[in-house]
UniProtKB/Swiss-Prot annotation:
This is UPF0354 protein Lm4b_01619. It holds the Pfam family DUF1444. Transmembrane segments: none annotated. Belongs to the UPF0354 family.
Length: 266
C-alpha cells in the first residue's frame, strides 16, 4: 500500500467531509486542516490522523469524520439548560484549551490544576455542547448551580475498571468511551476509595478525554511504564489533555514529571 502523505490525507478528509456551506483551509506550516461551517470551526492535525490511519486504517478517518459531523450538529442546536439538568457534566480539558467560542462567547469554566481546566457541557447523546456563560442568564441559573448539578450527575456514572500489572505495579483503566472517562478524575469520592485500596503511590493520568489511568506505583519501573503509556495515549487521542501524570496525596492532585526510569519530583 502506498504511503499516506499529508496532501493525500488532506484530500481524503476534504472528500469525506464535503458538504454544502462548508469550507476548508489548509495551514502548510502547521499541517492542519480547518473545517468551517456556519461560523463554527474544527481544526484537524493531519500528522496525528496519519499516525492513527497507519494503525487502524480507514476506521481512523471514519472516527474523525464522525467527530467533526457530530461537533457541527451540536454547535447548531439550541440547548435549554433548565430542561436538561440531568444531562450536564463537567469535562476536563488542557489549560491551553480555548475558553471562548470562535464567535467570542465565554465558556463556563473552573480552575482545576496547573495542567487541566474544568468546562461544563450538555450531553446530546452522541456529542455534547459546551455551556456558555450567556446561557446561564437565559436559564436563570448560577455558575454554582451548574457546578453542583454537573458533579452530582458525574457521581452517578459507573466506573468500570480494567486492571493490568507489570512487575508488581498495578494499573487500572477507565475506558467506557462515553465522553467522560477523563471527567471521572473529578469524582473525589472515587479517588478517596481508590487511595484506600492501593498500597503504593497513587498516580493518575488523563492523556485524552476517553481514558483515565490509575497507577498503584511500587517502584521506578512503575513510573517508567506509566510515563510510556501516558505518552502513547496522549499521541493517539482525538482530544489530548496532558501527558503529565498526577500524584494523589491528601485529597490533592499534583502534576509530576517522569523521565527515563526515575521519577523527578517538582
Amino acid at each position: 500500500m502506498a504511503k499516506m502523505t499529508t496532501l493525500k490525507m488532506k484530500e481524503k478528509l476534504e472528500k469525506e467531509l464535503q458538504a454544502p456551506n462548508r469550507q476548508f483551509s489548509y495551514n502548510r506550516d502547521n499541517d492542519t486542516l480547518t473545517v468551517a461551517q456556519n461560523g463554527k470551526k474544527v481544526t484537524l492535525t493531519i500528522p496525528q490522523i496519519i499516525a492513527n490511519f497507519e494503525n487502524d486504517g480507514n476506521a481512523a478517518v471514519e472516527k474523525i469524520v464522525y467527530y467533526v459531523e457530530e461537533g457541527f450538529r451540536a454547535a447548531a442546536g439550541n440547548v435549554e439548560l433548565e430542561n436538561n439538568k440531568a444531562s450536564i457534566y463537567p469535562v476536563v480539558r488542557a489549560t491551553s484549551f480555548p475558553d471562548e467560542t470562535k464567535a467570542g462567547e465565554a465558556l463556563l469554566t473552573d480552575d482545576h490544576t496547573a495542567e487541566t481546566k474544568i468546562f461544563y457541557a450538555v450531553d446530546l447523546g452522541k456529542s455534547y455542547r459546551f455551556i456558555e456563560e450567556s446561557m446561564l442568564k437565559k436559564a436563570q441559573l448560577t455558575h454554582k448551580e451548574i457546578r453542583e448539578v454537573a458533579f452530582n450527575n458525574l457521581a452517578n456514572l459507573e466506573i468500570p475498571l480494567k486492571k493490568d500489572s507489570v512487575n508488581g505495579n498495578d494499573f487500572y483503566f477507565v475506558r467506557t468511551n462515553d465522553g467522560y472517562d477523563a471527567s471521572r478524575l473529578l469524582n473525589e469520592a472515587f479517588l478517596r476509595e481508590m487511595r484506600e485500596k492501593l498500597t503504593g503511590e497513587m498516580v493518575l493520568a488523563v492523556p485524552h478525554q476517553d481514558v483515565l489511568i490509575i497507577g498503584d506505583i511500587q517502584d521506578n519501573t512503575g513510573y517508567d511504564v506509566l510515563a510510556h503509556m501516558t505518552m502513547d495515549f496522549f499521541a493517539d487521542g482525538l482530544v489530548p489533555i496532558t501527558s503529565l501524570p498526577f500524584v494523589y496525596n491528601n485529597g490533592k492532585l499534583e502534576p509530576i514529571f517522569i523521565m527515563a526510569k526515575n521519577r523527578l519530583k517538582e
